[in-house]
Amino acid sequence: MTETANLFVLGAAGGVEWGTVIVQVLTFIVLLALLKKFAWGPLKDVMDKRERDINRDIDDAEQAKLNAQKLEEENKQKLKETQEEVQKILEDAKVQARQQQEQIIHEANVRANGMIETAQSEINSQKERAIADINNQVSELSVLIASKVLRKEISEQDQKALVDKYLKEAGDK
């Protein structure tokens, strides 16, 4: 059995045909050369292009990631600045409201004080007129009483009645 196996390995009973082996090797080498020239080059170019595309896509993705992170940081900064600006506006509004409140209160106090002074002035003026009127009436009454007294002597009771009468007359005027 081993002998039959050797025959199949070495070729049919005639041995190895070196001419056929050389032709097959040369055909294989020519086939490899043709494959290298016509198939391997374009296939390698396709593979290289694909590798460049993948690398470019990876670079683009990394750049997009960096851009997204940068944009996120910018947005955070803008949000922070906006919040600070809103806070400042609110604080300014509070300060302005307090100032307006103080100004309104001050103006109201000035007006009230002016009104009080005007009222005091009016009261004093009316008081002075009333005192002047009373003084005039007292003077008139005194003159009247004196003229009556000079005409006749009056008792204390009559004098009191006379003063009351003139005061009543003066009050009716």
From Swiss-Prot:
Keywords: ATP synthesis, Cell membrane, CF(0), Hydrogen ion transport, Ion transport, Membrane, Transmembrane, Transmembrane helix, Transport. It is found in: Cell membrane; Membrane raft. It holds the Pfam family ATP-synt_B. GO terms for molecular function: proton-transporting ATP synthase activity, rotational mechanism; proton-transporting ATPase activity, rotational mechanism. It comes from the Bacteria. GO terms for cellular component: membrane raft; plasma membrane; proton-transporting ATP synthase complex. The chain crosses the membrane at residues 15-35. It is a single-pass membrane protein. Belongs to the ATPase B chain family. F(1)F(0) ATP synthase produces ATP from ADP in the presence of a proton or sodium gradient. F-type ATPases consist of two structural domains, F(1) containing the extramembraneous catalytic core and F(0) containing the membrane proton channel, linked together by a central stalk and a peripheral stalk. During catalysis, ATP synthesis in the catalytic domain of F(1) is coupled via a rotary mechanism of the central stalk subunits to proton translocation. Component of the F(0) channel, it forms part of the peripheral stalk, linking F(1) to F(0). F-type ATPases have 2 components, F(1) - the catalytic core - and F(0) - the membrane proton channel. F(1) has five subunits: alpha(3), beta(3), gamma(1), delta(1), epsilon(1). F(0) has three main subunits: a(1), b(2) and c(10-14). The alpha and beta chains form an alternating ring which encloses part of the gamma chain. F(1) is attached to F(0) by a central stalk formed by the gamma and epsilon chains, while a peripheral stalk is formed by the delta and b chains. NCBIfam families: ATP_synt_b (TIGR01144), PRK13453.1 (NF009987). This is ATP synthase subunit b. It comes from Staphylococcus aureus (strain N315).
